């Protein structure tokens, strides 16, 4: 059945290239909702999200200007296993509430919702399809080391905190899934995204 809007979840492992793919899809006319962006908005100074984080972990997670120091929060997250659960308990309901409100405001076209933890949190319910940005683990580690200026051990720890590549590749058991491999040149990725964009708009 033809629909005025198609809801597509975009996911992938850390440093797989999700942001680049979503940027390219936006250029081609897709509407983008990015949970990484929302996650920053719900911890802006003065928000309940930031107040609850400070109440739980103390002012050491704040920068000198009162904003969230994301590096310090990340250190807290990896220090104790239960800290991750506490952070998620505080932030995830706020993020998902804002995501739903933004999705409800979109009534036509191709809607792309970037959800890094789609597989881990089994959030496929609202969506018609999925896009999985996939790359080799070694590529992720290299990109993480360059992007975050960390060593390989820290990068591997960050990878282990997420679903495995194999788990993500089973996403098609829950949603029709287009896999975009991102192991090579940006020019190759652009061609793949352009073809996928044409496929998605054909569903409308």
What feature does the model see in each segment?
Residues 1-37:
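Walker A (P-loop) phosphate-binding motif
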Residues 21-22, 32-44, 59, 136, ...:
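N-terminal polybasic phosphate/anion-binding patch
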Residues 24, 28, 50-54, 137-145, ...:
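An amphipathic alpha-helix signature
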Residues 31, 37, 129, 176-178:
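Well-ordered beta-strand positions
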Residues 37-108:
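ATP-dependent small-molecule kinase phosphotransfer cores
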Residues 93-97, 111-116, 157-163:
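Short gly/ser/thr-rich secondary-structure transition/capping motifs
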Residues 112, 125-148, 158:
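Conserved phosphate-donor/acceptor-positioning beta-strand/loop module used by diverse small-molecule
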Residues 125-126, 146-201:
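Small-molecule kinase domains that catalyze NTP-dependent phosphoryl transfer to phosphate-bearing small molecules
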């Amino acid at each position: 059945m033809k629909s005025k809007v198609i809801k597509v979840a975009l996911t992938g492992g850390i440093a797989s290239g999700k942001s680049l793919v979503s940027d390219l899809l936006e250029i081609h006319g897709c509407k983008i909702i990015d949970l990484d962006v929302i996650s920053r908005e719900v911890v802006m100074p003065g928000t309940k999200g930031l107040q609850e984080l400070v109440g739980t972990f103390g002012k050491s997670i704040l920068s000198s200007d009162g904003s969230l120091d994301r590096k310090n929060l990340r250190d807290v997250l990896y220090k104790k296993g239960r800290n991750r659960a506490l952070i998620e308990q505080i932030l995830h309901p706020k993020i998902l509430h804002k995501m739903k409100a933004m999705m409800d405001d979109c009534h036509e076209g191709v809607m792309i919702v970037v959800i890094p933890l789609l597989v881990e949190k089994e959030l496929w319910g609202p969506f018609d399809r999925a896009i999985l940005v996939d790359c080799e683990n070694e590529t992720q580690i290299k990109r993480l080391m360059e992007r975050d200026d960390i060593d390989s051990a820290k990068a591997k720890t960050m990878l282990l905190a997420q679903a495995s590549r194999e788990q993500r590749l089973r996403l098609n058991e829950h949603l029709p899934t287009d896999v975009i491999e991102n192991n090579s040149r940006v020019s190759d990725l652009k061609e793949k995204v352009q073809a996928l964009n044409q496929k998605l708009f054909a569903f409308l």
